Amino acid sequence: MGTEETPVSREFLSRTLLAAKGFLLEGESALSISWMLVSELEKSGLFNAGLGAISQDDGVVRRDVGTMNGADLKALGLMSLVATPSPMDLLVRLYSRTRHVLLSGAMAESWGVRHHISTPGRLSPPLDKAMAIWERKMGTPGGGTVGAVVRDMAGHVASTTSTGGMGDMLPGRIGDSSIPGAGYYADDELGAISMTGHGEGILTMAMGIRLLEAHQGAEDPLTARKNCERILCSLERRTSYQAGAILVSQKNGPLVLHLGERMLTGCLLEKDQILIRDQWPGRSMAQEKMLNGQ
């Protein structure tokens, strides 16, 4: 949330989505494509994740990332990474090497140091651009989190989310992006979702799984959207926080929804039509077959 559409971001998202479609048509898995998308988003430096991540109050960048495969429900979340500029580099390498769901900080990065992914004893500093964003956002809900939800040719789904957090963070703060059921979730029987917004609200109301179940359980796509809108409004009413989501449910298809002013999202429709917006007023897109990348 909060990321505006610009010519640079539009060109980047268009190019990245077209590459993702190529991988889909070649039979790549939903999980691997979600990894590719979020890795590109991290490395672009355009968003509050990876190279563009902002600092916490002590000037240290701590990055969180999470992924889940709907086929086998395997999830991995890494949090408070300080020596890994692109958390996806570490997550992809660790994913098949551990049965754990959550790994944090120095212990997670110790493996990355041994395999030359993370830099020992060196903090990853924020870019000047990221610091300027942080200064503007002091005391406001987080924005610029990146994520992808994918349904592949076999019908499997996956979700990946990565973030640098939000402005005005106490050192050590952990948000929703590394927590399954909150900032991301994927289940072949339901669908896949990636969240953005104020992590404290997303965590306390388990927004990821709640929205996905509401969308999948509705009778039709229009009802599904209305159900999700009510849940987001409940989040704002009960916690004063806002959030946004990209999701695809197996029954009712894709949805882009947000309460904040902006949420930059790119979608690749049939016949290579690309739809990129930073505002998604209440229209249903459930009849459009597309790949979603946030």
Regions found by a protein language model. Give the residues of each.
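Alpha/propeptide regions of enzymes that mature by internal proteolysis
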Residues: 1-294
